[in-house]
């Protein structure tokens, strides 16, 4: 049956994207490109965005089918809440951007507050309905050390979900980059889930994986559609949630290493400019730095995918040992 769920997720996305693209074009829901960005990106102006709606809809439909036919699918209900919650924040952000015809959507404060709200509701639902057995301790990779957080674990959950939601969002700046890295990441978490005996979470990861495989052909260079914040914020939130539900939180540092590096590059760039007036990179996130030193977009994407695959395998090894 897992094969059926995977095929359903793949087909729904693959069919929906070519239906959605002309609709988005007709509604003029095109991406605005930063003027200070690489000049090679200016030709992407007007490319339809909000494509994440397709794979999110695929995930929701397929997951509902699983919930109907699979016993003990409660973890999937919780993951669906996170998917829809973070996806809705991204959708609102995208909608404001395309209506205003600029690259500014929700304010940072509005976005953070909404994300924090989803994270807190996730924790409350998990506890009230006993859907997650929180360890409240963080296990340090390669050691037998576990750091007890007690009530501070709630703060960690909020930080983890909000942080990775925005990390994937920052990474989604090149054609196919975030999609490919997410495919790698969900592959690792699918394997980890089945090894750890978390079948429902494993099935959800398979659904994520194949829904994104249906989206990738339309998103690789030259992209016919972008996932937008609708997709990227949801993906990051889901990654963090899965790592929490598996009690393998720090495995995400490796499985999502490229997302972490991209985020750190932005933080370092901002800090350096504020403190010294100088920039460390030609542009951040760091994928733009490599473009500006002469790498083609496709080279940056494939190298980052390779890094994501290697670090993802390390994260998988950490999670199953």
Curated annotation (Swiss-Prot):
One Gene Ontology molecular-function label: metal ion binding
Enzyme type, top EC level: transferase
InterPro entries on file: Glycosyl_transferase_4 (IPR000715), PNAcMuramoyl-5peptid_Trfase (IPR003524), PNAcMuramoyl-5peptid_Trfase_CS (IPR018480)
GO BP annotations listed: cell division; cell wall organization; peptidoglycan biosynthetic process; regulation of cell shape
EC number(s) from the headed UniProt entry: 2.7.8.13
Domain of life where this protein originates: Bacteria
Keyword DNA-binding set for record: no
Pfam family name, one: Glycos_transf_4
Pathway(s) the chain acts in: Cell wall biogenesis; peptidoglycan biosynthesis
Catalyzed reactions per annotation: UDP-N-acetyl-alpha-D-muramoyl-L-alanyl-gamma-D-glutamyl-L-lysyl-D-alanyl-D-alanine + di-trans,octa-cis-undecaprenyl phosphate = Mur2Ac(oyl-L-Ala-gamma-D-Glu-L-Lys-D-Ala-D-Ala)-di-trans,octa-cis-undecaprenyl diphosphate + UMP
Location in the cell: Cell membrane
Alphabetized CDD domains for the sequence: GT_MraY
GO CC terms in record: plasma membrane
Entry's transmembrane regions: 1-21, 50-70, 76-96, 112-132, 140-160, 176-196, 200-220, 225-245, 250-270, 300-320
Protein family according to the UniProt entry: Belongs to the glycosyltransferase 4 family. MraY subfamily.
Annotated function: Catalyzes the initial step of the lipid cycle reactions in the biosynthesis of the cell wall peptidoglycan: transfers peptidoglycan precursor phospho-MurNAc-pentapeptide from UDP-MurNAc-pentapeptide onto the lipid carrier undecaprenyl phosphate, yielding undecaprenyl-pyrophosphoryl-MurNAc-pentapeptide, known as lipid I.
Annotated protein name in UniProt: Phospho-N-acetylmuramoyl-pentapeptide-transferase
Native organism: Staphylococcus aureus (strain MSSA476)
């Amino acid at each position: 049956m897992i094969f059926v769920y995977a095929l359903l997720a793949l087909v729904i996305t693959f069919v929906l994207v070519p239906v959605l693209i002309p609709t988005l074009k007709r509604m003029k829901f095109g991406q605005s490109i930063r003027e200070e960005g690489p000049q090679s990106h200016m030709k992407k102006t007007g490319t339809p965005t909000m494509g994440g709606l397709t794979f999110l809809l695929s995930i929701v439909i397929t997951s509902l089918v699983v919930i109907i036919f699979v016993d003990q699918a409660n973890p999937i209900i919780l993951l669906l809440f996170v998917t829809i919650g973070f996806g809705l924040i991204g959708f609102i952000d995208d909608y404001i951007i395309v209506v205003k015809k600029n690259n500014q959507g929700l304010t940072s404060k509005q976005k953070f507050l909404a994300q924090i709200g989803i994270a807190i509701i996730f924790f409350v639902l998990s506890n009230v309905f006993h859907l997650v057995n929180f360890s409240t301790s963080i296990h340090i990779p390669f050691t037998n050390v576990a750091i007890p957080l007690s009530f501070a674990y709630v703060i960690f959950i909020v930080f983890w979900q909000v942080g990775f939601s925005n990390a994937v969002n920052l990474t989604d700046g090149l054609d196919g980059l975030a999609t490919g890295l997410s495919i790698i990441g969900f592959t690792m978490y699918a394997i980890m889930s089945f090894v750890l005996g978390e079948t429902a979470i494993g099935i959800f990861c398979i659904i994520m994986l194949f829904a994104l495989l249906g989206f990738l052909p339309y998103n690789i260079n030259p992209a016919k559609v972008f996932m937008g914040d609708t997709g990227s914020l949801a993906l990051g939130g889901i990654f963090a949630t899965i790592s929490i539900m598996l009690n393998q939180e720090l495995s995400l540092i490796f499985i999502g290493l490229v997302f972490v590096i991209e985020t750190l590059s932005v933080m370092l760039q901002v800090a350096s400019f504020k403190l010294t007036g100088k920039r460390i990179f030609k542009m951040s996130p760091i994928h733009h730095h490599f473009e500006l030193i002469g790498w083609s977009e496709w080279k940056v994407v494939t190298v980052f995918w390779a890094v994501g695959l290697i670090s993802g395998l390390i994260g998988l090894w950490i999670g199953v040992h």
